[in-house]
Amino acid sequence: MTDTISILQLSDTHFLDDGAEAEGGGAYNTSEAFDAVFDYIGDHDHLDMVVVTGDVADHGKAAEYRKAADAFSRFRVPVNVCPGNHDFDAAFTAGIARIGVSTSRVIEVGAWAFLFVDSSAGKMLQQENGLHIDPPGETRLHSNGSLGAREAAWIDQMCETTNAEHIFVWLHHPPQPTIPMCHDDAYAAEWHDILNAHAKIRGFGGGHTHIPNDYELLDRPVFVSPSLKNNFSMEPQTWLPPGYRTYEFGADGSVNSEVQLVDDERWPRLPFGSLLASLFRGEITFAELDEIIARRSDVTGD
């Protein structure tokens, strides 16, 4: 292995069981999208690792994780996965593991420590036996990030005890995203406290928004990966094809990343309407969007 570490990031793969309907509608066929992305990547033997940052399954079902694990195991390099808000703990833990596919929390390579954070941990319920589970009867499909005291303390501990010179955080919810509908003041505050305490953290790789971009938070880069379910650009306001991100990590602490989108006529870059724009700007909620679409369907008879 050279001093440079090469990693490929997938996010928001949203695998579906055969015949199942995608949550929220407007979705690509994610199995088809994965195949297209895998073919577009081509030779990947130079990679040190593939990282998947959550929303692995669309409904958090065991069959969806089996499909995802089968897909990820096609890579000839190690794959490591962390959960997103669509991923339900028990099914995720039981279904994703395969030879070469893992859910490790910390991976140290060369000068780097890669932390894999559960950015929905603050929404979990602690049982009497100490295990954390999804609250029964509740959904976090459209929820923003929340570390909670337990996950934040774990991050602090890892940052304080690692011998690595540099730390990079992989997670589903990017901290303080630039997309208004995904911004959460409490979640941003959690990360401000952590970043102010740990100078070794060099940046973040996340997903969740389905709007690939990058920005800075307290002088650290935050890289947001494309999705396989649907992708959007805000400038111009268009749909985007499925894709992924590539990363190069230098021994000096440098991080370089690029978005890669599949060039395929199956996913044309068409304009999207004002309703989606209003959703992304935080002017309406998902529930309000569903109500508007339902009213329009009643009028048109669709």
PLM feature spans:
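Extended active-site neighborhood of metal-dependent phosphoesterases/phosphodiesterases
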Residues: 62-157, 161, 190-200, 216-230, ...
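Short, flexible/disordered intra-domain loops and linkers
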Residues: 20-29, 179-185, 233-237
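N-terminal active-site segment of His-dependent metallophosphoesterases
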Residues: 1-67
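Binuclear metal-dependent phosphoesterase catalytic core
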Residues: 213-302
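Active-site-proximal beta-strand elements of phosphoester/diester hydrolases
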Residues: 4-20, 111-126, 168-172, 221-226, ...
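His/acidic metal-ligating clusters that form di-metal
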Residues: 37-50, 134-221, 278-301
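Active-site glycine-centered loops adjacent to acidic/histidine catalytic or metal-binding residues
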Residues: 12, 54-55, 84-85, 172, ...
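Short N-terminal helix/helix-N-cap motif within the alpha/beta-hydrolase-1
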Residues: 18, 61-62, 90-91, 178-179
